């Protein structure tokens, strides 16, 4: 059958992409359809056609999948965030387990590896400790706060995201009322005019400390003291309170949310939080895992896989603000962390001091440059190497150096099981064996899943 653009087709959704689009086939031709899940029988309009695959828009669901549920969020379809919210949570976890397993086999050539069920959450809502709300104006001139629709910069009004903290709505309502009362305009990215661009809210789930950071296209907000008073007058359940109110200055014509300069209006330039027994100091620009409940599970698995006895030297690559490094340092002889972002390393050093940890040392730079240089010039040693790279995975130069260093164990923490599988294939081809694999659901209702892998050196001494 010839597939024609703008024609409607009936198809059975058989699979999902990592981005959460359903995959159906018309005589073998794959059509990706948003807002569908496996088992749905749908009518879809073909909107964009390539040689071997195309995209369709959901017109109607003829017969819903047994795994389809009513999304709790009223804007789930329009918002670009929770692509899997119409799928039962149990099925989401199975989809993610299958995704990991399939990538290991298809990309890594690693068949026969047991992939156990993904570790999910008892309550997969209200789990995010950070939210960034763009601020704009609707067609009627009203201030709107919410999230961008998928692949656009069109704001979907939503001040109470169900995967975010329940404190967000009250804070946003107060800021919006303040803006209206004082005739403060929201930012327009087309004309580069207006003042308020974003509102960033961070919460320490264990400490109850809250940070409110208003991102502005200017140097100050009119009547800042009044805004501070209004925010501090808010009350929150479970003894949570605002510990930091800041402005972040971003005058650039850019899609980057935060500028480099912050100014404190109240409290400290940071909040604090714990993962396990380790305390972390978090600033507006700090990278910090957004799901603290699952992060603790993830790090405990990584720590278990590392098999530390107190005598090991560990290298933690792509260490960020030292979140995993400091977990490891409590059980290791020495930990070296490497991270490309200077500010993150400053946070890592601060966090080490905050916890009285003196056996962690940090380097600024690319992991694929620092580790080979240290190995070639100083012949550094590693009993265990932990890697937690970005989605693109590890550079081959880094993997090559890791193999040369021949640690007993490699613990690979991945946010993309496709690049994970590619890198594991290299390591398996160079003397390492995959011993354990575990998925952890850090981003409930999205297509993303974190995976932890233990590899052991099989080469003879």
Describe every region a protein language model picked out.
Residues 201, 208-217, 279-283, 384:
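Short, aliphatic-rich beta-strand segments
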Residues 22-27, 146-149, 213-215, 348:
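Short, acidic/hydrophobic/Gly-rich beta-strand patch recurrent on exposed beta strands
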Residues 59-71, 77-186, 206, 221:
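Extended interfacial segments that mediate partner engagement and assembly in macromolecular machines
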Residues 53, 207-211, 447:
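Conserved loop-to-beta-strand segment in the C-terminal subdomain of adenylate-forming
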Residues 2-7, 18, 222-461:
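Rossmann-like S-adenosyl-L-methionine
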Residues 116-124, 189, 198, 439-442:
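Short, solvent-exposed loop/turn elements at beta->coil junctions and helix N-caps
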Residues 1-75, 361, 368-369:
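Terminal RNA-binding accessory module
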Residues 193-206:
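Short edge beta-strands and adjacent turn/loop segments
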């Amino acid at each position: 059958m010839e597939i024609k653009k703008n024609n409607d087709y009936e198809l059975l959704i058989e699979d999902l992409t990592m981005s959460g689009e359903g995959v159906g086939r018309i005589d073998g031709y794959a059509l990706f359809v948003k807002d569908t899940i496996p088992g749905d029988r749908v009518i879809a309009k073909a909107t964009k056609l390539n040689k071997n695959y195309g995209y369709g828009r959901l017109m109607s669901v003829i017969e819903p999948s047994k795994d389809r549920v009513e999304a709790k969020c009223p804007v789930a379809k329009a918002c670009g965030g929770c692509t899997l919210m119409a799928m039962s949570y149990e099925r989401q976890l199975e989809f993610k387990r299958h995704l990991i397993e399939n990538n290991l086999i298809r990309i890594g050539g690693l068949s026969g590896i047991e992939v156990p069920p993904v570790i999910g959450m008892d309550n997969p809502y209200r789990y995010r400790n950070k939210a960034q709300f763009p601020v704009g104006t609707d067609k009627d001139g009203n201030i709107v706060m919410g999230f961008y629709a998928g692949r656009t910069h069109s704001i979907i009004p939503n001040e109470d995201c169900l995967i975010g903290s329940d404190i967000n709505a009250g804070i946003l309502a107060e800021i919006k009322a303040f803006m209206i009362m004082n005739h403060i305009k929201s930012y327009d990215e087309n004309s580069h005019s207006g003042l308020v661009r974003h509102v960033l809210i961070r919460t320490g789930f264990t400490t109850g400390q809250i940070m409110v950071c208003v991102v502005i296209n200017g140097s100050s907000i009119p009547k800042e003291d009044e805004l501070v008073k209004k925010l501090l007058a808010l009350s929150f359940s479970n003894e949570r309170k605002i510990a930091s109110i800041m402005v972040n200055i971003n005058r650039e014509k850019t899609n980057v949310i935060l500028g480099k300069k912050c100014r404190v209006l109240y409290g400290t330039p940071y909040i604090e939080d714990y993962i396990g027994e380790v305390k972390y100091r978090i600033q507006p620009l700090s990278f910090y895992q957004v799901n603290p409940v699952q992060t603790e599970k993830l790090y405990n698995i990584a720590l278990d896989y590392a098999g530390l006895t107190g005598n090991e030297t560990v290298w933690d690559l792509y260490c960020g603000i030292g979140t995993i490094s400091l977990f490891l340092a409590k059980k290791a002889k020495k930990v070296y962390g490497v991270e490309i972002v200077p500010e993150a390393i400053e946070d890592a050093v601060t966090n080490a001091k905050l916890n009285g940890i003196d056996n962690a040392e940090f380097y600024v730079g690319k992991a694929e440059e620092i580790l080979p240089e240290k190995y070639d010039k100083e012949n550094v040693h590693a009993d265990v190497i932990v890697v937690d790279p970005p989605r693109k995975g590890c550079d081959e130069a880094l993997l090559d150096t890791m193999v040369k260093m021949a640690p007993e164990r490699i613990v690979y923490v991945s946010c993309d099981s496709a690049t994970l599988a590619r890198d594991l294939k290299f390591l398996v081809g160079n003397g390492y064996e995959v011993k354990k694999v575990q998925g952890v659901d850090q981003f409930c209702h999205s297509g993303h899943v974190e995976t932890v892998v233990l590899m052991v050196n099989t080469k003879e001494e």
